[in-house]
Amino acid sequence: MDYQTLLQNQLLSSNNIDYLVELIISNFRISKKATIKCINIITNNLSTYLNNIDRFPENNNELVDAINFLNNKCIEDFAIYLTNKYPNTNIFRNSSNQSSQSNQVNQSNQSSPSSQISPSSQVNKFNQSSQINQSNQINQSNQINQSNQLNHHSEEFQEFIILTEQEKNHLLKTHGINSLTTDKKKYKKTIEDDVITILSNPIMMQMFGLMLNQSSQPKKPDIIFDQILDSKQVIELKNQFQNKSVVSKSTESKTNLGSNTNIIINSKINHETDNKFSNKPNGNNDETNDKTNNETNDETNDETDNDDEIDNNIDLNVKLDNITTSDVPVILDKLRNLKILRETYVNKGNKKIANKIQNKIIQIVETLNAYKNKQSQIAIEAKNKIKHITVSNKEVSENIELIELEFNPNCDLEMLTENNYINLKNLFIKKIPDRKITDITLVEYLLPNNDYNITKFNNKFKIYSNSRLYSIDIPPSKYEINTLLSYIKNQLQFIDFQINDDNIISIKSQTDFELIVDRIEETVFPILGFNGKQSDYKDKSEYIATKSYNLNSKVYFSLQGVAMEPIEVIMGTKISYNKSIKKSSAGITIKNLVLNFKTELDQFYDFNDTFKMSLSITYQS
């Protein structure tokens, strides 16, 4: 006889599970709405027991014992489950009968089935009769147990002695304990604990330390972040921290050319060249001339500085009559230092030197404005040459189309928007008909040569240090490596650059910082030799480039969405190429014709003049 199968069938039968559910609902505070959940829990528990049994019954007696044992264990595990889920709740329907009910359940489960079964009877009949007998015996045992417990409790209550409040106090006083003093001690102890907790707070200890002048922290200078200061406040700060010496290069300042207001910035730095040239020279000259006329009438009290010192301080090392775009960042840095230096001498009372510096400042401002007007005129002339983007299509034959493109990058933004040349990166030319293409040939091209190695597409330098994000937009120009690094260092003076004999650049700082290279193609880092991932530039005080710097990279042409080898292009001259750049005998499908021009550093090329290109497209017949 297969007792293993009988045990599984009887335990997982609907009669046995219903019996356990009724037993649980009658003894525990469970709503009948949770019957389905109880059935699932009981079924899972019984299945787990069956899967973990090492030895199965070999006769009817062992079968009965196994069923009773597993049913009892299921109820116990269910009680433990409820207790863990509701630790602060009485889960029994009658708390006074909690222990007696569990005992009676065990006794009834173990005694009644054995009296109803005989070796010759069927196991199914046994299970039905045992379940009925179990429920009857549980009810009877509950009634008997309640009466026994009442008698038991009555006997226990007879052993208690009820004392009045006076008798209790007398006993406590006799043994040297007073309830009132005990309460006071408890109350005082609670107050003392609260006081100790408050005093042990680090903030309170720091406040007491400051009150008693016991703070051992060194006094730090008052640093003002993102505040607008007038010229006198700036001079006071300079003199306080630099012992009234000439202002050092370590101060970050951003000076408005049209006013006497200096802005000290230690947070995010955004430099825009156009804004620096946007001040009107006439108003500035009037203001400076008035100041000069008023100041020349005053007598100076302190003229200890000689002319050699003045010349050394205001020498720009740049010819102002023939400046280029690459000279502008250097001149602007010198201009900032001169304006701060002038305020320093004004504060000292040395107006003679201050007037000489002011004259030099006026000369620089006039030169910069003249250069800006010249560049604006050049841009206007370039815009007047070609007013729009020209794309002409010529059908050489039924299946061959010749596309001639002429594009001017100096047109206004409105025209760019209308022709989908918003960012000048992915140059959308036209939509391609829904036909398969078998050949694309580059006929000829004329691409202008942009000498700038720093353009609007790769001029960002971002780092994260001391919980601040520092961002610099480097003015587009042609830079030598030392000029480029000097410009960055002048804006972020807490970092330093070094170049070894192999032209490998390292960036250092006194504290840990992070290079922000999440969109590395838009930054200057690839030019400096840093082309790693964001995770490579975190929580270090020094970063070393993976390859040497590259200021003059080659330019490559490709079609977006077309699998092809990028073509190196020659700049500054008209080239008749007449070579196929993509062939496919089966034909390929292209939705849009989009041109890409990138450097070997995978950065977009910035056109500064009109370029032309002719492409021939052969469609499948």
From Swiss-Prot:
What species is given as this protein's source? Acanthamoeba polyphaga mimivirus
Output this protein's name: Uncharacterized protein L356
**Ranges of Low complexity composition bias in the record:** 94-134
Q: Where is the composition biased (Acidic residues)?
A: 296-310
Q: Which residues form a coiled coil?
A: 354-401
Q: Spell out the residue ranges making up region: Disordered.
A: 92-134, 268-310
**Is Coiled coil given among the entry's keywords?**
yes
Q: Which UniProt keywords apply?
A: Coiled coil
